[in-house]
Amino acid sequence: MSDSAEMQQPELLLKSMNKLNGYHPQLIIPKKTLFKCDLDDKQSRLQVSSMHMENSGFLTEDEKRTIEAQKMKKRRTAGLRVAFIDPESQQYVLELHKWTKSYAFVKGWNKVVDKNDKTFKVGDVFSLWVFRCGGVNPVHDGVNLSGGHADSVVDGLEQGSLCFVLVPAKVSVHDGNLPQDSGHDGHNDNLPQDSVEPSSFFDESYELNHLFFDQEDSQGYLPDEDEDFGFNDDGSIRDSGHYQ
């Protein structure tokens, strides 16, 4: 059994797994801090470090190929479609993209931010979990969900698809429940906390996705990786007009 499976699993994760017949839960990021750039509707993405995503080993070979194919094309092509559950148990379908030095949840992230605009704040800390979705449980909380449901994340997703759960850190990871190799500050030594401001995490400007409005995307923006941009002091991506 994995370290994350042995940990106390948060209630939000367990409820989500029950509703979606989930299996193989795994803690991906013990501490993910929201920065200004994560909540900016013009950047329209939740960015996470490659170290967490790749060291966790939860991606299948087919999923890796899908993500790598999207990265190599460096165009606004589809990434890996995944389910995503916010702290209020609201469900979405997002795309997971791989950039040069990070991964990002895009194509729908703006909707997550809009739905949580009263609760998401810069500096909030969450943990990010993932499990495999086996399909909607026909009966959940006394409600019959058979025959499809408007809120079903499996609509359009295959069984076995990834489902990510964003859990407020105060109810997810506690010092006494961390893996044995974790440090006293509440993070796994093998999976460093993803709470470093992007502007200080990277010392060089690096190829991030400049964002263009997609008229067919009601969620806002899709990335294009043809240009090289750096970070502002607040962690936001420098606009080309200000990049020297």
From Swiss-Prot:
InterPro entries: At2g31720-like (IPR005508), DNA-bd_pseudobarrel_sf (IPR015300). GO terms for cellular component: nucleus. It is found in: Nucleus. Residues 235-244 have a biased composition (Basic and acidic residues). Keywords: DNA-binding, Nucleus, Transcription, Transcription regulation. The keyword Transcription applies. Residues 175-196, 217-244 are annotated as: Disordered. Residues 49-147 bind DNA. SUPFAM superfamilies: DNA-binding pseudobarrel domain. One of its GO terms (molecular function) is DNA binding. It comes from the Eukaryota. Its main location: nucleus. This is Putative B3 domain-containing protein At2g31460. It comes from Arabidopsis thaliana (Mouse-ear cress). The lineage of its organism: Eukaryota, Viridiplantae, Streptophyta, Embryophyta, Tracheophyta.
